[in-house]
Structure formats: C-alpha cells, structure tokens
C-alpha cells in the first residue's frame, strides 16, 4: 500500500477538522491506497471519548465521512459533497485501544453520484461501525474553480504494520 499525498498542505486557509495536520484540535487523518480501497489508521485516546473509554459516535461518523471523501477524490480526481450518510454502530470502539482501521470502498457509481461504504475495524479485526454514504461529485472544472487539488499515491510500498507504526506515533 502507498500513502496518498495531501495536496492542500501549505494552502492558505486549509484547516480541515478531519485531515489537516496543523489543526490543533483536529483528527489529523492520513490516507493510504490499499488495492482499490482507501485506508486510514486512526490513533485513539481519551480526547475523543463520549462515554468513559468509548469513542464518541460523532467522531466515528466524521472518520467514516472523511474516508469516503478521500476515496472519491482519489477515484475520480475531483471533489464532491456528502448528500446522504447512514451510520450503523455495531460495537463500542474503546479509546484504550492503540488504533482503529478506517476503510472506504466504492459500491456503485452512476454518472456523478457515488455510493460508498466505509468501515471502522478494531485492532483484532472486529467490525465496530460502518456507513453507507452517497456523494455528489463535482465536474472537474467546478472542482478547480473552488480550489480542488487532486491527490496521488506517493512513496514506497508499505505493509499494514508499517502504516500502523507511522500512524500511531
């Protein structure tokens, strides 16, 4: 698997709660291309809890939405917006775990409408939550007008273990 570059690094005003590494209260997600899927390893901690030692459901929803957005960005080379999102919470995500795996895949595409599925998986491989997201993708010219920059896979091939190690530092 290879890391996806973040093309907005250094762009004035870029402060995405989910993926900007410079946002002091953000999630600082990094993304990787794993076959056809986009993957992120999210390090856990008590700052993200709702109930004691439990990851807040709103944080889970944000992780699921953002991974789908990056799947769209990489797949189509354009931007888009979430038009519908349905989240199912299957089991608690414990903030005492070192990390979770967040993954997105394309289910269906009809012209500029995409159906994506995202999952949150525990370190032991259990499904914790998932979302089905419908996205509206912008025509490339519209995306350029609003400052969209495409992302691409960069660097050397990495194993899952290497991605986990570099993500939970």
Question: What kind of feature is each model-predicted range?
Answer:
Residues 23, 36, 81, 96-98, ...:
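Residue-level preference for beta-strand/loop junctions
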Residues 39-63:
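A conserved, well-ordered hydrophobic junction motif at loop->secondary-structure transitions
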